[in-house]
């Protein structure tokens, strides 16, 4: 029996209590973005209603309240991922921004002949920054491939060599749903003196994260995938590495002193936070972290595993339906990509929407993986704390209805 009560949790999400196409909404697009509990919405409005002021600039009461709330949120995020210090917690726009910042750091340190190792399952945000860094420095981008719907660890280990300077991998694939052993991989990277980057976009919302235990050098995450607002995220980096990194943007409040011909930078973390930040978003992300922490990340992970254990075998049993990723539900996170023989994924997603079921269809910002799988796109259902086994049943029923509809029209 799960420690989570999804029916009680749903009461905090008014958006879920609606009808779509004459059917109760079943929201299964959580890998794209999650819904927001009322406390997060209230926190956003409270900032604008009561404390709207810029941070780290004024000495008046509103500015000091806003600054205190902003920095309190940073501390909440530090605890959430177990960073050593708030100096290691940089506010960003999201995972994409964080990975781009790491890519800019790579441009500082890569040299011709160096190698960056990623996997074929990566999101474009964990591919293109490395492509650009390698183009600019003469380094080589190396891919590890798949075995049985998961990362081929033997292939990865063979690709990590003395030439490797960065290893960058998603902890959880946003298509395959597989959970990569990033702690083990970090050891392989560090054995050859490489930096380890863990894309936490699909893991931080769903499982307990301890960056010190993982021993990763960087860990970006997105707030909107973990009940927070859009446009806010975090890049974790080890303090000693962040001190080596050049600032990415320049301007207000990231400077210590500006002379006519040069300038000096503030200490961490502020040297990376130029200009007015997303103050409301950062504070509301802190409220989202409070909400998740109260539920317990271990409980969240266990509950989502219950849902996957329940629905994955049902999907695998449907004739003509292919599920991508690990066959064993115990190795599968709450992200399930699938195709139905003879049907385009966009048609499938549209038909499911007629049944009130919201899923995503497309290449999921992972075109190299999609090409590697030999398909053009896929439908994807993804689960979170407010989904229920009834939602799983509705997904399966809607897939059967979709198959029946198209079989009658083909």
Predicted regions and their residues:
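Pyridoxal 5′-phosphate
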Residues: 1-410
């Amino acid at each position: 029996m799960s420690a989570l009560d999804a029916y009680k949790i749903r009461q905090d999400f008014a958006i879920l209590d609606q009808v779509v196409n004459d059917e109760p909404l079943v929201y299964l697009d959580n890998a794209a973005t999650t819904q927001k509990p009322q406390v997060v919405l209230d926190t956003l409005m409270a900032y604008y209603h009561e404390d709207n002021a810029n941070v780290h600039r004024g000495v008046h009461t509103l500015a000091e309240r806003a600054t205190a709330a902003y920095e309190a949120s940073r501390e909440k995020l530090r605890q959430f991922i177990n960073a050593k210090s708030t100096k290691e917690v940089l506010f960003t726009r999201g995972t994409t921004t964080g990975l781009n910042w790491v890519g800019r750091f790579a441009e500082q340190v890569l040299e011709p002949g160096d190698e960056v190792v990623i996997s074929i399952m990566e999101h474009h945000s964990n591919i293109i920054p490395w492509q650009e860094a390698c183009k600019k420095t003469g380094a080589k981008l190396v891919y590890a491939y798949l075995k049985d719907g998961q990362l081929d660890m033997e292939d990865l280990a063979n690709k990590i060599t003395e030439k490797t300077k960065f290893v960058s991998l998603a902890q959880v694939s946003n298509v395959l749903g597989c959970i990569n052993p990033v702690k083990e991989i970090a050891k392989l990277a560090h054995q050859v003196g490489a930096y380890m980057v863990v894309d936490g976009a699909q893991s931080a919302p769903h499982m307990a994260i301890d960056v010190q235990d993982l021993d990763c050098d960087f860990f970006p995450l997105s707030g909107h995938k973990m009940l927070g607002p859009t446009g806010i995220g975090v890049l974790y980096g080890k303090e000693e590495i962040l001190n080596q990194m050049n600032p990415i943007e320049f301007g207000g409040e990231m400077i210590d002193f500006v002379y006519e011909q040069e300038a000096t930078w503030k200490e961490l973390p502020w040297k990376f936070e130029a200009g007015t930040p997303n103050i409301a978003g950062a504070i509301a992300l802190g409220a989202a972290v409070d909400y998740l922490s109260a539920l317990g990340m271990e409980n969240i992970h266990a509950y989502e595993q219950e849902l996957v254990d329940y629905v994955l075998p049902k999907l695998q049993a449907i004739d003509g339906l292919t599920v991508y990723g690990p066959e064993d539900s115990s190795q599968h996170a709450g992200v399930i990509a699938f195709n139905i023989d003879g049907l385009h994924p966009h048609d499938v997603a549209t038909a499911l929407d007629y049944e009130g079921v919201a899923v995503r269809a497309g290449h999921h910002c992972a075109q190299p993986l999609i090409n590697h799988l030999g398909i053009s796109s896929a439908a994807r259902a993804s689960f979170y704390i407010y989904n229920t086994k009834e939602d799983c049943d509705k997904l399966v029923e809607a897939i059967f209805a979709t198959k029946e509809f198209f079989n009658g029209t083909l």
